[in-house]
């Protein structure tokens, strides 16, 4: 941890006692701040709340008392990224002119380790995991490590406080929720894998707001830093060029004009062959793109082709992201629960040459699934739909001419139905194309239940 004066002696309100709220509170205490922690949940029996109270934090649970801002002056409000800006406490802080920041900004300002940041609508977690493993392979030769932190599930504050040293590297996954509140981060390399519409618009309200939040990943970089941009998304690229001072390098699915691109047989950096495509374990063109971005970041940070090959030739996927689960009677089963929108489902469905039995459905967020019709025609032999969107997806399947369409209420029934339809040589693909919140708390929980139900079939 780097000693900084920014938060020393400051009166700070931390909003939300999740894992990141707990971690950033401990870091801020170490940096000399005075803390109040507030969560609308009852914290009377919460062990984390007790631990913070024992360290001198004023803990207030059970409500969001906006009159706190009338009782005393706060220098900062550190909010959980998932808490919307319409929250009464956040709105009151804004009204009072209190700077509103999030955990990543606090943690990265105190990091003595250099860091790189990755964001995007789809693919950021896989890209972060690949980058972390490549860089760890490289750094271990020197006795150091790379850590995958941030939106991937490990609070940056926790690693900055307890693990990472000056010769280590933080590979940071950042969501649009985290980036929206950022006012000062400077990654050595920033990357935006892709940006699609219809993602988190319930939080950001407009697509422009969503893009602006994503662009914060490189907005505060210097000319000595690097920014990796998707050459194939020209409208976004134009905005990236205006947003960052860093040197922009581009990547593309097939255009050799880009700095990094997917060639005929190799992932390329200019004329240099970086990795043989046939040796990459992850399926799908989108994972070649994720691999390409990881290669770009890692090579800029010093890793060699031996480090890249060691990881890409063995890495089989992140949980819930086109994750291979098992083979049932000759049917390969994949868990793509992270597919919470149409774009993510599209890349998953396109990833296989074998006939697919698709299991899809979930929360109805107003998506129109007609854009999947042509894709269904080319790849899907049968479909099982469930959840709030079951009839909408079934209707799209009918338009595609799919003859075998099964509509069920829940995921458990869906797994059983899909397994009966799939034959040896097929792929059973769970790619919901919808958020999980109609029946599950998170896409991770949804994916865990999918794997559980598949394993139950395997044991019969």
From Swiss-Prot:
Its EC number is 6.3.2.9. It comes from the Bacteria. Pathway: Cell wall biogenesis; peptidoglycan biosynthesis. It catalyses: UDP-N-acetyl-alpha-D-muramoyl-L-alanine + D-glutamate + ATP = UDP-N-acetyl-alpha-D-muramoyl-L-alanyl-D-glutamate + ADP + phosphate + H(+). Signal peptide: none annotated. Gene3D superfamilies: Mur ligase, C-terminal domain (3.90.190.20), Mur-like, catalytic domain (3.40.1190.10), NAD(P)-binding Rossmann-like Domain (3.40.50.720). InterPro entries: Mur-like_cat_sf, Mur_ligase_C, Mur_ligase_C_dom_sf, Mur_ligase_cen, MurD. One of its GO terms (molecular function) is ATP binding. ATP binds at residues 120-126. The keyword RNA-binding does not apply. PANTHER family: UDP-N-ACETYLMURAMOYLALANINE--D-GLUTAMATE LIGASE. Belongs to the MurCDEF family. This is UDP-N-acetylmuramoylalanine--D-glutamate ligase. It comes from Lactobacillus delbrueckii subsp. bulgaricus (strain ATCC BAA-365 / Lb-18). The lineage of its organism: Bacteria, Bacillati, Bacillota, Bacilli, Lactobacillales. The gene is murD.
């Amino acid at each position: 941890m780097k000693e900084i004066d920014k938060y020393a002696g400051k009166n700070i309100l931390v909003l939300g006692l999740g894992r990141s709220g707990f971690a950033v509170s401990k870091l801020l205490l170490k940096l000399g701040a005075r803390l109040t922690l507030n969560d609308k949940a009852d914290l009377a029996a919460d062990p984390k709340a007790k631990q913070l109270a024992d360290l001198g934090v004023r803990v207030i649970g059970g409500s969001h008392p906006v009159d706190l801002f009338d009782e005393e002056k706060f220098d900062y409000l550190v909010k959980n990224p998932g808490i919307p800006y319409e929250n009464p406490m956040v709105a009151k802080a804004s009204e009072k002119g209190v700077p509103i920041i999030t955990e990543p900004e606090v943690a990265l300002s105190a990091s003595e380790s250099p860091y790189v940041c990755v964001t995007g609508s789809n693919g950021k977690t896989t890209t972060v995991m690949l980058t972390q493993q490549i860089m760890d392979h490289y750094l271990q030769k020197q006795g150091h490590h790379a850590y995958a932190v941030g939106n991937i599930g490990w609070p940056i504050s926790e690693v900055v406080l307890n693990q990472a040293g000056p010769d280590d590297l933080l590979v940071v996954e950042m969501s649009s929720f985290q980036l929206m509140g950022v006012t000062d981060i400077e990654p050595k390399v920033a990357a935006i894998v892709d940006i699609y519409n219809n993602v988190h618009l319930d939080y950001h309200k407009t697509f422009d707001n969503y893009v602006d939040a994503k662009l914060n990943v490189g907005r505060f970089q210097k000319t000595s830093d690097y920014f990796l941009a998707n050459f194939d998304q020209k409208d976004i690229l134009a905005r990236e060029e205006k947003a960052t001072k860093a040197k922009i390098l581009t990547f593309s699915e097939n255009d050799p004009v880009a700095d990094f691109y997917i060639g005929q047989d190799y992932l390329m950096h200019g004329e240099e062959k970086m990795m043989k495509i046939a040796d990459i374990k992850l399926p799908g063109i989108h994972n070649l793109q994720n691999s390409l971005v990881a290669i770009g970041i890692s090579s800029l940070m010093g890793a060699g082709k031996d480090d890249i090959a060691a990881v890409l030739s063995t890495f089989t996927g992140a949980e819930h992201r086109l994750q291979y689960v098992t083979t049932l009677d000759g049917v390969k089963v994949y868990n793509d629960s992270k597919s919470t929108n149409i774009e993510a489902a599209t890349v998953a469905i396109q990833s296989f040459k074998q006939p697919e039995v698709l299991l899809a459905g979930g929360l109805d967020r107003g998506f129109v699934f007609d854009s999947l019709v042509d894709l269904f025609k080319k790849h899907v032999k049968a479909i099982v739909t469930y959840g709030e969107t079951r009839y909408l997806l079934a209707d799209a399947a009918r338009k595609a001419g799919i003859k075998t369409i099964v509509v069920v209420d829940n995921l458990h029934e869906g797994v059983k139905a899909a397994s009966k339809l799939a034959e040896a040589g097929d792929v059973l693909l769970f790619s919901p194309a919808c958020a999980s919140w109609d029946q599950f708390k998170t896409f991770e929980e949804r994916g865990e239940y999918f794997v559980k139900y598949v394993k139950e079939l395997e044991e019969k």
